[in-house]
Amino acid sequence: MLKGANQVMVNKMTADFIAEAKKATLESKFAGFGYEAIVDGIAELNLEDESKVFVVIPNAWKADLRKDDDYKSARMGEVIYNGQVGTICGIPVIATKALTDTAFVMTAEAVKLLMEEDVEVEQDRDIETKINTVVLSTYYICALVDATKICKLTANA
């Protein structure tokens, strides 16, 4: 029961994070998703230090990325053996089911999830009816705090 409640809470936080990320003002459009689309998104950020940049892509785009000739040649066949999404230009690529038609090149400074307090768990048991009640509460805010640190990647219409 608690495992399911935790998953619901994590899914809500993920949805809130994605909703804030979609407010990004920087945008890079592409004809076909792959190495060039990500590199253009990185360039759009115009950062001197790219060490904290990462890319978040929809799960469905992993295959396109793995088939990209630039990606395959950069990994020198390694992708065939380890099966990971990997890195592009030394930047980690993360895939998620929470995205469907948009990817993001960003740093952790772009979107913040600020917790007011840790998750609070309360439980109660009615001894006569043998009913247990468990309530989880959390208070947080998720916000796009630095729009210069996130670039939305979308396909040309």
Where are these regions (language model features)?
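Long, contiguous amphipathic alpha-helices that act as assembly "spine/axial" helices in icosahedral shell
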Residues: 1-28, 46-49, 55, 93, ...
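Extended, solvent-exposed, turn-rich assembly/linker loops in the middle of proteins
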Residues: 19-89
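Sequence/fold signature of self-assembling virion shell proteins
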Residues: 68-157
